[in-house]
Design a protein with these regions (language model features):
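C-terminal regulatory/interaction regions
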Residues: 2-18, 289-357
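N-terminal amphipathic/basic leader segments beginning at the initiator methionine
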Residues: 7-32, 36
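Conserved beta-strand hairpin/beta-sheet module of binuclear metal-dependent hydrolase folds
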Residues: 26-88, 208-224
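Divalent metal-coordination and catalytic microenvironments
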Residues: 35, 55, 65, 97, ...
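Short, charged, surface-exposed secondary-structure boundary motifs
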Residues: 49, 126-131, 226-228
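Metallo-beta-lactamase
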Residues: 61-71, 165-178, 185-187, 192-285
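Active-site HxH/HxHxD metal-binding segment of metal-dependent hydrolases
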Residues: 72-74, 78-187, 214
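Aromatic/hydrophobic pocket-lining residues that form the small-molecule binding cavity
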Residues: 77, 245, 249, 325
Length: 357
């Protein structure tokens, strides 16, 4: 249904309503709200897709997110531009954040249509920094970080070999951008969209809220079925992204009307934002309780995976799982509930503090 009202294909799942029916195939689009087209591009990952959106903008379109830099994604855009987008020009490209599945083709699209790129400052600058790592040697600080987490020499060697891979998934970024900040209002076509900033999954994530009819482009800040990765990385080993994430979720729950129609980057558009935000918050609180039980015995970051993840952690997701484990450990440390001691081999062993026992 065009306005997010439940139609014959609508279904309910865990307190959320999905009104929009089956997702579009690559190159196709579904009108999910007035002036909003939902499209989908494949990802060569276990999370096998990203949703991208086109917003009617006068005689053209504003795009929100772009997919990875792959031939399949480019073909999907070519088909969409010639098909549901009607051959109209792209006037602006907005990226919710700097992860490659979101910015991968931003530069390609901006150059093709001479369109400006709109992002928050921290996301743009972080993307440029990570792209610049391509071809550079892996820093020793990263090896120290992962050894402290409990990685083996072999795992650290593989990390060194793959270092700088971010740039391979991202087309060259525009050398200039337009900054988006909290509470900015963008005029897109006949509509005003308010910028809402989230934190935790990334430094300065942009969401877009059309307050007139309650349409909310959530990016990765609110997903219907999975919780976005929240990780500490070697560049900021003492960071507290989980604290930022939880504070953002609490603030969004207090701010957003319960009847919003949420258009996420993964999964399907849904109603039930308050229910979903509460579930995300509760999920991390439950994980922290399991983690505290694990820390009754000294543990490395890699030892706490079973407390946080339902499935075994393979090498393909080891860095993300490690980052998320350290995010939870750092959070407990800031709360005075956990401490760490580094042994002579450079490995951190985490335990509960006396106050938390």
């Amino acid at each position: 249904m065009a306005d997010g009202v439940a139609g014959p294909d609508a279904r309910m799942e865990r307190g959320l309503t999905y009104p929009s029916g089956p997702p579009p195939e690559p190159g196709q689009a579904v009108a999910v709200a007035p002036g909003v087209l939902w499209m989908r591009l494949p990802l060569p990952l276990s999370l096998n897709h990203i949703n991208v959106y086109a917003l009617a903008d006068g005689d053209g379109w504003t795009l929100v997110d772009t997919g990875l830099k792959t031939g399949v994604s480019k073909a999907g855009w070519d088909a969409a531009l010639a098909g549901p987008l009607g051959g109209k020009p792209i006037k602006r490209v907005i990226c919710t954040h700097m992860h490659p599945d979101h910015i991968g083709l931003a530069g390609w699209l901006c150059e093709r249509f001479q369109a400006p790129l709109l992002m928050s400052r921290l996301e743009y600058v972080t993307a440029r920094m990570l792209i610049a790592d391509e071809g550079q040697p892996a820093p020793d600080a990263g090896a120290v970080f992962y050894r402290a987490a409990g990685w083996s020499d072999e795992q650290i060697a593989r990390w060194r070999t793959g270092y700088g891979g971010f740039g391979k998934a991202v087309a060259a970024m525009p050398a200039a951008y337009q900054r988006l900040s909290e509470n900015d209002v963008l005029r897109i076509g006949d509509d005003d969209w308010r910028v809402v900033i989230g934190e935790g999954h990334c430094p300065e994530h942009v969401c877009l809220w059309r307050e007139g009819d309650g349409v909310f482009l959530s990016g990765d800040q609110i997903l219907p079925r999975i919780s976005s990765n929240v990780s500490v990385w070697p560049t900021e080993p003492e960071g507290d992204p989980l604290g930022e994430w939880l504070r953002s979720l609490v603030a969004l729950k207090a701010r957003l009307p319960s009847d919003l129609f949420v258009l996420p980057s993964h999964g399907e558009p849904f109603h039930g934002v308050a229910t979903r935000l509460e579930a995300l918050i509760r999920g991390h609180e439950t994980a922290l309780k399991r983690l505290e039980r694990t820390l009754r015995a000294p543990s490395r970051a890699v030892d706490v995976f079973p407390a946080l993840f339902a499935r075994p952690v393979g090498d393909e997701v080891l860095s993300m799982a490690t980052g998320e484990a350290i995010a939870h450990l750092n959070y407990l440390a800031r709360e005075g509930r956990a401490r760490r001691d580094r042994d002579e081999a450079g490995v951190d062993w985490w335990t509960l503090t006396e106050a938390a026992k």
